[in-house]
UniProtKB/Swiss-Prot annotation:
Region named Polymerase: 768-1016
Reactions accelerated catalytically: DNA(n) + a 2'-deoxyribonucleoside 5'-triphosphate = DNA(n+1) + diphosphate
Biological process according to GO: DNA-templated DNA replication; double-strand break repair
Entry EC number(s): 2.7.7.7
Function: In addition to polymerase activity, this DNA polymerase exhibits 3'-5' and 5'-3' exonuclease activity.
Protein's recorded name: DNA polymerase I
Gene, per the UniProt record: polA
Superkingdom of the source species: Bacteria
Gene Ontology MF terms in the entry: 3'-5' exonuclease activity; 5'-3' exonuclease activity; DNA binding; DNA-directed DNA polymerase activity
Enzyme class: transferase
Quaternary assembly: Single-chain monomer with multiple functions.
Length: 1016
C-alpha cells in the first residue's frame, strides 16, 4: 500500500458528490467474520486468553483488500468503501414470518466477544462501520448499491453470498475475495440458470434451509430456473400453475402459493433502509497508521503490525497499544446472538440442491450438496446428447426485416445467452468488411442436457454477383447496415447477455472497427485450449467433429476455391444462411459441451484469469499496430542481397561447381555424394537430409561448406521473410504493420504471431538487430521495450527450490557466472568469457532437457566432456534432477503437467511404446511447466498493464503494441516516458501477485528509444 494513503489523522473530510467514474466497495462484514472464524484454527491473546482468531482473520482479509484491490480480479482501487454488519437477528423479517431463521444456532461462545472487536478493527482501519437496527446487512448493502448505481458509479459487493446476487447489474458486481473472482451477470446465469433480476423469484421458489425460508417443497434451483424460463416470473407461474403437466409438481405449487409469495418477501432485499451516513461519507479516507498499529498491538498481531508499520513508515515500537473495549454477555451485539439451539421444524424444510451457506454456524460449516447435475455429470450428459443430435439446416432462419431481428434479440436477452459469428470479406480483421452475422439461441427444456437450439443469419450487404456502374448491386430484402448495427451493438455490449463465439478475437477486432465493443463473452476455442492443450486442434471444424460428430459445411462449398473463389458478399443468401447459421449453431453446442468441463477439471480460474481477459487486450494491440521505416527495409534488403551473393560465390568455390543452393537434392548430392562427408542420412524419399540440424552438426565438426550454407540460409530467410515482405504488410489506411496473435497455437501457453511473424526476428545476430531498427516510433513518441531478465531460470529456481539459484537471484548475482563458479571452481571476478558462455549454454540447455550430444554440438566439444558437464551440474544442483524426475512422473501418472498457475499441458503419448516418442514427450514435460509458467506471467502482466496505466492517467498516452516472447513493446509520448516506465516495470515484476508470491524476484529491464533495436 503506497505511503501516500497514510496519515496521522483520522478526521473524515467533506467530499464532492459521488459520480460516474467512482467505485464503491461494500464489504459484507458479517460474511467476513464467519469466513475468518471458520477458516482459521482457534487463536487466543497470550496475555489473557481472549479469543482473537476471527479478529485476526478479519484484519488480514481487510488489509489484503485495501492493499491489493487493483491487483485482484476486480482490477480497481475503490474511491469509496464501507463495511456493513448485521445489528442482530431481530429484523422486520421476523415480523413477516416468526420462524425466519428459527433454526439458526447461537454462535460459538469464543466468537461472541469478537463481534465488537471486529467493529473496533473496522474503525481502526478508518473505515465506516455501518449497521442498522431492524435490518440485515444485506438490506443496507442493497440500499447503498442502488443509490450509488443511480449516480453512475460502479459498485463492488465484497461477498459471495447468493442472497446478494439479485443486486448484480452492469454497474454492480460481487467479489469473492477467497477465490479472487469477480461475479457478474454471466456468472450468476452460469451458476443459477437465471439472470440476477430473477434471483428473487428463484429463491422464493427454492426456499432456504439455512434461513428457514419455506419456499415450495421439492423445487430446487434447476427446476426453478426451468420454470422461470418457461413462465417468465413467479407471478405468472402461480397464475398459470394449473397448466403444469407434471401432476405432483402442479399440486405442490398450487398448495404452496401463499408460502411462495411469503418467501419472496423474505428473500427480497430492501433498498430503502434509513441510513445515518450518505454515499459521500463513504469516501475512502487515508489510513491512520498509528491508530491502526495501536489496535493491532493490543490484539498482539505481530506480523500484521510489522507490515502496516512498513507500509506507513511508522516506528511501531514508539506507538502505545490502544485501549479497546470488549463486549461480553448482554453488551455483545452480533448476528444470531439471540438465537437458540434449533428446535426440529414440523415437517421440515427440504434441502435445496445447490444452496450456498454464506454465514453458517460452526456445526453447519460445510456447503450444502450440489444439485443433481455436477459439472462433470452435466458435461458428460451433454457430450452424449450432442454427439448424436442431428443438424437441421432447413430450420435455419434468414432474418430480412427489423421486426424479426428485434424479436431474436429480445429472445437472446431473455435467455441471457447467445452464440454469434460474423461473415466478412477477408480473414484479415483489420481490412475485412462486415457482410452479415449469425445468431444461435438455446431454448432450455426440462432436461438441462436436452437443449433445443435455434439459429439464424442476418445478411446485410450481399450483392447480386454483378455490381452496376452506379454503385448499387445489393441483393434484395436485406436489413440496411445503418439499421442493423445499432441493434447488434446494443446486444453485444449488453453485459447481461453472455456472448459465445469461436475465435472471438477476430470478431472483436472487426466489430471494434464498426464502433462495437463486445462485452461479457466466452470463446469456445479458448475453452478448448485450456481443457485440451496438446491433444489436438482447437478450430471449430475439428472440435465439431470431435464433440458433435458433425463436419461443418466447408467454406469452399459456398464460396468456391481457386480461381472460382468469391468473397462472401457474393455468396447466394440462402447458401450463406446454411453456412453462417450452422457456425453459430455449432459454436453454441460446443459451448454447452465444453463449458461445464472447466469447472469439472478445476480449470475455470485458468480460463478466467489467463485466457478470456487477454483476448480484448490482444485485439487492441493488433488494432494499434507498429510503424516500420520502408527506407530502412529497402536498404537492408539490398545489403542482404549483396551478402547472399558473396556467400554464393564462396559456396561455389568450396563445392567446385555452381548448383542450386536452395535445392535440398542438389545440396545433398554435393555434400554426401561428391564431397563424401560423413554423418549423412537419407529421408523416406531416398534423398539426403540437409536439415538445419544436419548442416549445423557438420559445421560443428569443422566442415566449411555446411557452415556457409547455414549462413546463406539465414541471410536469404531474413531477406524474403522480413526486409522484402514487411512493406507488403503495411496497412493502406493506418500505414502501420498489424500482426495477428494466436492464443491457442502452442501447447505451453506462449503466444504466436503471424501475418507477419514478429517473434522470430533474430536478436543475437547483427542482421536481425538491423531489421529491428526499422520498427520505429511516430514523431513525438518513443518505443519502450520492457523485457523479463532470465525469467525461465527464475521460474526454475522457484519451482525446483534450488537454494544457490534462489540466493543468486535475490542478491542480483550474474547467474551464469555463479553457475560457472559452482561447476568449474573459477572465481567470478576475472572469469574468462568462454567459461561463462559454457555455463550459460548449460543453464538454458538443462531447462530444455538437452542431451550430451546436443550440448557437445552447441559448445563444439566432445560428447564425453559434455556428459561430464551435465553430470557435474546435477551434482551441484541436485534439486533440478529431482524436479525433472517429478515432472516426468506426473506426466506419466496424469497425462499432463502444470504451470505455476495451474495451466495444464497434456502429453497423451507420454506412455508410448515407441522409445523415441516417449523420450520426446518426457523432455517436453520437463520444460513445459517452466516455459508455460513464464508465458502465464507475461499474460498476467499484459492483463494488468492497462488498468495500471488508467490509474495513473496514462491510458491514452501509453499504448502496448507488441509481445515478443518475454518482451513487451509500448509506444509512449515523449513527455510521459519517465512516468510510464516505472509503472510498466512494477506491473511486470509483480505480475504473479496476489495469486502467487515467487520465491525469487522477477526482474524487468526497460529502455526507451526511437526504434526497437535501441530500446531493447
Amino acid at each position: 500500500m503506497p505511503n501516500s494513503i497514510w496519515t496521522s489523522s483520522d478526521a473524515r473530510a467533506i467530499h464532492a458528490r459521488m459520480k460516474k467514474g467512482d467505485h464503491l466497495f461494500l464489504v459484507d462484514g458479517s460474511g467476513f467474520i464467519f469466513r475468518a472464524f471458520h477458516a482459521l484454527p482457534p487463536l487466543t491473546r497470550k496475555t489473557d486468553g481472549l479469543p482473537i482468531g476471527a479478529v485476526s482473520g478479519f484484519c488480514n482479509m481487510l488489509w489484503k483488500l485495501l492493499r491489493d484491490a487493483r491487483n485482484t480480479d476486480v482490477g480497481v482501487t475503490p474511491t469509496h468503501l464501507a463495511v456493513i454488519f448485521d445489528y442482530s437477528a431481530k429484523t422486520f423479517r421476523k415480523d413477516l414470518y416468526d420462524a425466519y431463521k428459527a433454526n439458526r444456532s447461537a454462535p460459538p461462545e469464543e466468537l461472541i466477544p469478537q463481534f465488537g472487536l471486529i467493529r473496533e478493527a473496522t474503525r481502526a482501519f478508518n473505515l465506516p462501520c455501518i449497521e442498522t437496527e431492524g435490518f440485515e446487512a444485506d438490506d443496507i448493502i442493497a440500499t447503498y448499491a442502488r443509490q450509488a448505481e443511480a449516480t453512475g458509479a460502479d459498485v463492488t459487493i465484497v461477498s459471495s453470498d447468493k442472497d446478494l446476487m439479485q443486486l448484480v447489474s452492469p454497474n454492480v458486481h460481487m467479489y469473492d475475495s477467497m477465490k479472487d473472482k469477480q461475479i457478474g451477470i454471466p456468472d450468476v446465469i452460469e451458476k443459477w440458470g437465471v439472470p440476477p433480476e430473477k434471483m428473487i423469484d428463484l429463491q422464493a421458489m427454492t426456499g432456504d434451509s439455512v434461513d428457514n425460508v419455506p419456499g415450495i417443497p421439492g423445487i430446487g434451483p434447476k427446476t426453478a430456473a426451468q420454470l422461470l424460463e418457461e413462465y417468465g416470473d413467479l407471478d405468472t407461474l402461480l397464475e398459470r400453475a394449473t397448466e403444469i403437466k407434471q401432476v405432483k409438481r402442479r399440486e405442490t405449487i398450487l398448495a404452496n402459493i401463499d408460502m411462495a409469495r411469503l418467501s419472496r418477501d423474505l428473500v427480497r432485499l430492501r433498498t430503502d433502509v434509513p441510513l445515518d451516513l450518505d454515499l459521500d461519507a463513504l469516501v475512502l479516507e487515508p489510513q491512520n497508521g498509528p491508530k491502526l498499529i495501536g489496535f493491532l498491538k493490543t490484539m498482539e498481531f505481530t506480523t500484521l503490525t510489522r507490515r502496516v508499520a512498513e507500509a506507513c513508515d511508522c516506528d511501531a515500537s514508539a506507538i502505545e497499544p490502544a485501549i479497546v473495549r470488549i463486549e461480553w454477555g448482554e453488551t455483545a451485539r452480533g448476528p444470531d446472538l439471540d438465537a437458540a439451539e434449533p428446535e426440529p421444524v414440523a415437517g421440515g424444510i427440504p434441502e435445496v440442491s445447490g444452496e450456498s451457506v454464506p454465514m453458517p454456524p460452526r456445526a453447519k460449516a460445510k456447503s450444502a450438496v450440489e444439485g443433481a447435475f455436477s459439472p462433470a455429470d452435466l458435461a458428460k450428459a451433454r457430450a452424449e446428447a450432442f454427439a448424436t443430435l442431428p443438424f437441421d439446416h432447413s430450420a435455419y432462419v434468414t432474418i430480412r426485416d427489423l421486426v424479426t431481428l428485434d424479436r431474436w434479440i429480445a429472445d437472446a436477452r431473455a435467455t441471457g445467452l447467445v452464440a454469434f459469428d460474423t461473415e466478412t470479406t477477408s480473414l484479415d480483421a483489420m481490412q475485412a468488411e462486415l457482410v452479415g452475422f449469425s445468431l444461435a439461441i438455446a431454448d432450455n427444456t426440462a432436461d438441462p442436457t436436452g437443449t433445443k437450439i435455434r439459429a439464424a443469419y442476418v445478411p446485410l450487404v450481399h450483392k447480386n454477383g454483378v455490381g452496376d456502374l452506379l454503385g448499387g448491386g445489393l441483393a434484395d430484402n436485406q436489413i440496411p447496415m445503418r439499421d442493423a448495427l445499432p441493434r447488434l451493438k446494443a446486444l453485444l455490449e449488453d453485459e447481461s447477455v453472455l456472448k459465445v463465439a469461436q475465435n472471438l478475437k477476430y470478431d472483436y477486432l472487426l466489430l471494434k472497427r464498426y464502433g462495437i465493443e463486445t462485452r461479457s463473452f466466452d470463446d469456445t476455442m479458448l475453452i478448448s485450449y485450456v481443457l485440451d492443450a496438446g491433444t489436438g486442434a482447437h478450430g471449430m471444424d475439428p472440435l465439431s467433429e470431435k464433440f458433435l460428430g458433425h463436419t461443418p459445411i466447408p467454406y469452399k462449398d459456398v464460396a468456391g476455391s481457386g480461381k472460382a473463389n468469391v468473397t462472401f458478399d457474393l455468396v447466394d443468401i440462402d447458401r450463406a444462411t446454411h453456412y453462417a447459421a450452422e457456425d453459430a449453431d455449432v459454436t453454441l453446442r460446443l459451448w454447452l459441451v465444453l463449458k461445464p468441463r472447466l469447472a469439472a477439471a478445476g480449470l475455470t480460474s485458468v480460463y478466467e484469469r489467463l485466457e478470456r481477459p487477454l483476448l480484448p487486450v490482444l485485439a487492441r494491440m493488433e488494432a494499434r499496430g507498429i510503424t516500420v521505416d520502408r527506407q530502412i527495409l529497402s536498404r537492408l534488403s539490398g545489403e542482404l542481397a549483396q551478402g547472399a551473393a558473396r556467400l554464393e560465390d564462396e559456396i561455389y568455390v568450396l563445392a567446385g561447381e555452381r548448383f542450386n543452393i536452395g535445392s535440398p537434392k542438389q545440396l545433398g548430392d554435393i555434400l554426401f555424394g561428391k564431397m563424401g562427408l560423413s554423418g549423412g542420412s537419407k529421408t523416406k524419399t531416398g534423398q539426403w537430409s540437409t536439415s538445419a540440424q544436419v548442416l549445423e552438426d557438420l559445421a560443428a565438426a569443422g566442415f566449411e561448406l555446411p557452415r556457409k550454407i547455414v549462413d546463406w540460409r539465414q541471410v536469404t530467410k531474413l531477406k524474403s521473410t522480413y526486409t522484402d515482405a514487411l512493406p507488403g504488410y503495411v496497412h493502406p489506411e493506418t500505414k502501420r504493420v498489424h500482426t495477428s496473435y494466436s492464443l491457442a497455437s502452442t501447447t505451453t501457453g506462449r503466444l504466436s504471431s503471424s501475418e507477419p511473424n514478429l517473434q522470430n526476428i533474430p536478436v543475437r545476430t547483427a542482421e536481425g538487430r538491423k531489421i529491428r531498427t526499422a520498427f520505429i516510433s511516430t514523431p513525438g513518441h518513443k518505443l519502450i521495450s520492457a523485457d523479463y531478465s532470465q525469467i525461465e531460470l527464475r521460474v526454475l529456481a522457484h519451482v525446483a527450490e534450488i537454494p544457490q539459484l534462489t540466493k543468486a537471484f535475490e542478491d542480483g548475482v550474474d547467474i551464469h557466472a555463479m553457475t560457472a563458479s559452482e561447476m568449474f571452481g573459477v572465481p567470478v571476478e576475472g572469469m574468462p568469457g568462454e567459461v561463462r558462455r559454457r555455463a550459460k549454454a548449460i543453464n538454458f540447455g538443462i531447462i530444455y532437457g538437452i542431451s550430451a550430444f546436443g550440448l557437445a554440438n552447441q559448445l563444439s566439444i566432445e560428447r564425453s566432456e559434455a556428459g561430464d558437464y551435465i553430470k557435474k551440474y546435477f551434482e551441484r544442483f541436485p534439486g533440478i534432477r529431482d524436479y525433472m524426475e517429478s515432472r516426468k512422473a506426473m506426466a506419466r501418472d496424469k497425462g499432463y503437467v502444470e504451470t505455476i498457475f495451474g495451466r495444464r499441458i497434456n502429453y497423451p503419448e507420454i506412455r508410448s511404446s515407441n522409445p523415441s516418442v516417449r523420450a520426446f514427450n518426457e523432455r517436453a514435460a520437463i520444460n513445459a511447466p517452466i516455459q508455460g509458467s513464464a508465458a502465464d506471467v507475461i499474460r498476467r502482466a499484459m492483463i494488468k498493464i492497462e488498468p495500471a496505466l488508467v490509474e495513473v492517467g496514462l491510458a491514452d498516452r501509453v499504448r502496448m503494441l507488441l509481445q515478443v516472447h518475454d518482451e513487451l513493446i509500448f509506444e509512449v509520448e515523449d513527455q510521459d516516458v519517465e512516468k510510464a516506465m516505472p509503472v510498466i516495470v512494477s506491473v511486470m515484476e509483480n505480475a504473479t501477485m496476489p495469486a502467487l508470491e515467487m520465491r525469487v524476484p522477477l526482474r524487468v529491464d526497460a529502455r526507451a528509444a526511437t526504434n526497437w533495436d535501441e530500446a531493447h
